[in-house]
A protein has these predicted regions:
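Positively charged n-region of N-terminal signal peptides that target proteins for export
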Residues: 1-5
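Bacterial N-terminal signal peptides
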Residues: 8-18
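Sec/Tat signal peptide C-region and signal peptidase I cleavage site
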Residues: 20-22
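Asp-box/BNR beta-propeller blade signature and adjacent active/binding-site loops
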Residues: 24-388
Length: 388
């Protein structure tokens, strides 16, 4: 996203670290934010091209880090969500990437963004699983860390959008998982619902290590907000699950809900501060206990609206409606919105590797890039700047 106003030009330098998290009234969140902003968009030394094909839209990657701490598997579509699924592998923590790897023939039929996860069953057998959404949601399985895969097969008589946006290991038993997705009435059943679309977030449960999944259950809907793309993160003590939600009517901020009983029940949705407003939130804990959240910036008042950004703060900031510590612009998107469904991995040395698509060059089709960073690097950059 190209920013040219005087306000934006001032905002997009290395702006401010004020030290403590910035408080807001959670009952009336502002549409913008007052956080410091660290701008990494021009720091090409951090950027690694994962895949690029002239004239071809390459979109929406998700990634998974294997137990060796250096192998990352990425999957993404040739197209905007819909399109043949491409798979690549890095064996050096995202510094270099393989050529495109062989995939089963019916991966060519994918209708939605693929999402990949590590799972294990009650016996300790580890697998990789990959979902592909719309109707019906389908699943592929690898028993050998992604060297070979099954074809896509339906998991049930239901569909959904960005399935599965989050996968949460549950404390209810070994091999138990909760997967979260959304639908607007078009794909949850074989026949689309008639009447106005209503965005609803659903869960589905697996008790056999991700091989089979139960029927969808409603998690949350809202009379005004269009809630979707659930991004889950646990509290530091593991007892609570928070889910950050995109707000697709573009009238309100992003939302959050909480569960204290492993997803059986949920709090009423409430708005987040503008600093966390955006799409397709993906969150991981840094080694020091802070949270790094990467997403597409769609705050209603933001100099980086439409860009690939990140937020740094604490779980308590999310719970208490505080702005957090600072924001980061990861890359400049030359499109009003189309970018940043990111993968996010934390390497053993504390390096975050976050990967996504976007219009990174004017006039070019989107392609996939990884950005590497550490919290210590971000803290130094933020501390050297002034508050915005």
């Amino acid at each position: 996203m190209r920013i040219s106003t005087p306000f934006a030009a001032a905002a997009l330098g290395l702006l401010a670290l004020a030290g403590a998290s910035h408080a807001q009234d959670a009952a009336a969140p502002v549409r913008g934010y007052s956080l410091p902003l660290v701008d990494l968009a021009a720091d090409t030394a951090r950027q690694v091209i994962v895949d690029r094909e002239p004239g071809q839209y390459l979109g929406h990657p998700t990634t998974v880090l294997l137990e060796d701490g250096r192998t990352i598997v990425a999957v993404y579509p040739k197209g905007h969500g819909r399109g043949p699924i491409v798979m690549k592998r890095s064996t050096d923590g995202g510094r270099t990437w393989s050529e495109r790897l062989p995939t089963p023939p019916n991966w060519e039929t994918s209708l939605e963004v693929p999402t990949i996860y590590r799972v294990a069953d009650a016996k300790g057998t580890k697998r990789l699983i990959m979902f592909s959404g719309l109707y019906p949601v389908r699943l592929a399985v690898s028993e050998d860390d992604g060297a070979s895969w099954s074809g896509l097969a339906p998991i049930g008589n239901f569909g959904g959008i960005v399935a599965m946006a989050s996968l949460v290991p549950l404390r209810t038993g070994a091999g138990h998982y909760m997967a979260l997705f959304h639908d607007d009435g078009r794909f949850i059943a074989e026949r689309a619902a008639e009447g106005p679309r209503r965005f609803t977030v659903y869960k589905t449960i697996s008790t056999d290590g991700g091989l089979s999944w139960g029927p969808p259950e409603v998690v949350v809907s809202h009379p005004v907000a269009h809630l979707c793309e659930p991004g889950a993160v646990r509290s530091p003590d593991g007892k609570q699950i928070a889910v950050l939600l995109r707000e697709n009517s573009r009238k309100l901020n992003a939302f959050v809900i909480f569960s204290n009983d492993e997803g059986r029940t949920w709090t009423a949705p409430r708005e987040l501060p503008g600093a966390l407003t955006g799409d397709r939130h993906v969150a991981k804990y840094a080694p020091d206990g802070r949270i790094f959240v990467t997403f597409r910036d769609m705050a209603l008042e933001s100099a980086t609206k439409g860009d690939w950004v990140a937020w740094v703060g604490t779980y308590d900031d999310i719970v208490n409606g505080r702005e957090g510590q600072y924001r980061v612009r990861l890359m400049d998107n030359h499109n009003p919105w189309d970018c940043a469904y990111p993968g996010l991995e934390l390497l053993p040395d504390g390096t975050f590797v976050t990967t996504t698509y976007g219009y990174w060059e004017p006039g070019a089709e989107p392609y996939n890039v990884s950005v590497r960073l550490t919290m210590a690097e971000l803290d130094r950059l933020a501390a050297a700047a002034r508050r915005f």
